[in-house]
């Protein structure tokens, strides 16, 4: 897609498709503008291009822009670190039209578990009009810990992305994490 006619901007907020992502990233890189993206289903080459772009622009990519999910990432990483040897399973449920399975959020929760030393297994359910539910289970003989987040309204994702865009504007080039930007935020 040709985006050269797009007016000037401080931050691009992109929740499009993997096929449109390259043009948005190139526009931001060329203009030296920040990018907030929640586009999932990106290829390894697209993730590599995004990593290369952080040398010249600030980028925040997240699979989910909910403040609750940002906190859940931290809790999952900490639980994995504190519970070595426990099984880690991630169960995610979304509406029937969601195409990627496991979801980008489930995969990044798995990355958080891996940072803490756990290897996650995934189960995906597509049913009805569910906005998004993620449960991370840590289990061992005789006990289970379950960390869960349920989104009941899609507005939370837009609010989180706009908040992230305001905080990312003017930041130095680099890959920024949602949870770092939200750290000082109080609802």
Can you say where each PLM-predicted feature lies in the sequence?
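Rossmann-fold NAD(P)-binding glycine/threonine-rich loop
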Residues: 19-31, 38-61, 67-79
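C-terminal substrate-binding/catalytic lobe of Rossmann-fold NAD(P)-dependent oxidoreductases
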Residues: 1-9, 84-187
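Residue-level recognition of short, well-ordered coil/turn positions
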Residues: 32-33, 172
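N-terminal glycine-/serine-/threonine-rich beta1-alpha1-beta2 phosphate-ribose binding loop
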Residues: 1-30
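Short loop or secondary-structure boundary microenvironments that flank
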Residues: 17, 39-40, 65, 95, ...
